[in-house]
């Protein structure tokens, strides 16, 4: 535990600033994508990227909303951890992450997607009493209410994958933290479909985009 707090204290200020900035940047792009899709009329093209024989088989598991909401903390800590790997790698990480965000944003504007939560009957679970029900309502109501847009690629999957890829091969990062980052990325991806915030294809897109961007910026 002592080593953990020493590591936290050793994070450069710019690491924490970057974590908060990217969190705000994500939310800003999400809102801007929605707005531009409305203004340009591309929202009329919106479709549900549902693959029934896959998505209808995925069960609803409410407690996964914990991982879904915890992701915001994970996303702040991700850039902070990468800042411990040196400025050169940190710059590459920021470029790759920014490119991933912007690529996702292009999809939001020109290939808008949606989920009808009424049709999917998810509010049945959100209206149950208790902490899990409250967390589900919080997640849904802050993401469009009855209709959620900007599904593909899943930003939850995209950003979590970025945080993992940033530390995956770095010798400065402990094996334990790498395992933690990988496990959290998997759990967050699972949460998006288990609480019916996304469809399966959104996960594929959310993982493919950062894989491409990191391959480009880390090719040397």
Describe the residue ranges of each PLM region:
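N-terminal transmembrane-helix/juxtamembrane module of multi-pass inner/ER membrane proteins
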Residues: 1-75, 133
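Interfacial helix-loop-helix junctions of multi-pass membrane proteins
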Residues: 122, 144, 148-152, 187-214
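Aromatic-anchored segments of alpha-helical transmembrane domains
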Residues: 26-31, 101-110, 183-193
């Amino acid at each position: 535990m002592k080593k953990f707090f020493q590591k936290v204290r050793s994070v450069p200020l710019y690491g924490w600033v970057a974590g908060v900035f990217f969190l705000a940047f994500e939310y800003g792009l999400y809102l801007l994508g929605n707005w531009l899709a409305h203004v340009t009329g591309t929202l009329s093209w919106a479709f549900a990227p549902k693959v029934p024989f896959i998505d209808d088989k995925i069960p609803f598991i409410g407690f996964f909303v914990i991982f879904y909401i915890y992701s915001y903390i994970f996303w702040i800590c991700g850039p902070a951890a990468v800042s411990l790997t040196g400025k050169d790698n940190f710059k590459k990480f920021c470029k790759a992450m920014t490119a991933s965000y912007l690529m996702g944003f292009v999809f939001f504007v020109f290939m808008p997607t949606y989920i009808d939560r009424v049709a999917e009957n998810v509010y049945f679970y959100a209206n149950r009493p208790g902490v899990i029900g409250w967390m589900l309502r919080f997640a849904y109501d802050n993401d469009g209410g009855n209709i959620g847009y900007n599904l593909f690629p899943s930003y939850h999957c995209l950003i979590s994958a970025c945080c993992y890829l940033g530390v995956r091969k770095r010798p400065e990062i402990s094996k334990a933290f790498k395992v933690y980052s990988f496990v959290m990325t998997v759990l967050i991806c699972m949460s998006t479909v288990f609480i019916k915030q996304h469809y399966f294809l959104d996960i594929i897109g959310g993982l493919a985009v950062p894989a491409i961007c990191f391959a480009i910026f880390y090719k040397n």
